[in-house]
Amino acid sequence: MIHVEQLSKSFDDLRRGSIVALDSVSFDVEAGEIFGLLGPNGAGKTTCLRMLSTVLQPTGGVATVAGYDVMTQPQDVRTHIGFMSCNTGIYDRMTAWEMVEYFGRLYDIEENELQERLDRIFTTLQMNDIRDMLGSKMSTGMKQKVSIARTIIHDPPVLIFDEPTSGLDV
């Protein structure tokens, strides 16, 4: 499902020169497997996840997600993943339901199926009480639940979460 081989990322800094954010990381994740990246702050975990989601391009190595190369087939990768960044924004003027519904429409989910998925996700994540709440009125944990919901609305085969429990009571 995910194959990473010698994946690297460097950034150029005018003062410090080249900064290596990720250095030759390799791993494989099979379908159905839960896999976590562990390491101290600055180890490159978020950089790695952003490359897998095609937000950043690697400077070395190879990565495939659901059989698609992150460098040469980024659109195919994006349609097969749900990616939740650690700093995903929530629209202040939309309700929780509207935000998740909007993302479902971006993925062209048929209307009846979209409504069924919304009902199921809002019930499963215990979000019915914030269904009509504006983003501007939500707590950090509520916003995190909305981010999770919009990440999974299109039922992607691969989920990539960056700090998904931040702000949640777990």
What is the predicted role of each segment?
Residues 155:
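Conserved catalytic motifs of ABC-family nucleotide-binding domains
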Residues 40-44:
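Walker A (P-loop) phosphate-binding loop of ABC-type ATPase nucleotide-binding domains
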Residues 101, 105, 112-130:
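Conserved ABC ATPase "signature" region
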Residues 159-162:
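Catalytic Walker B motif of ABC-type/P-loop ATPase nucleotide-binding domains
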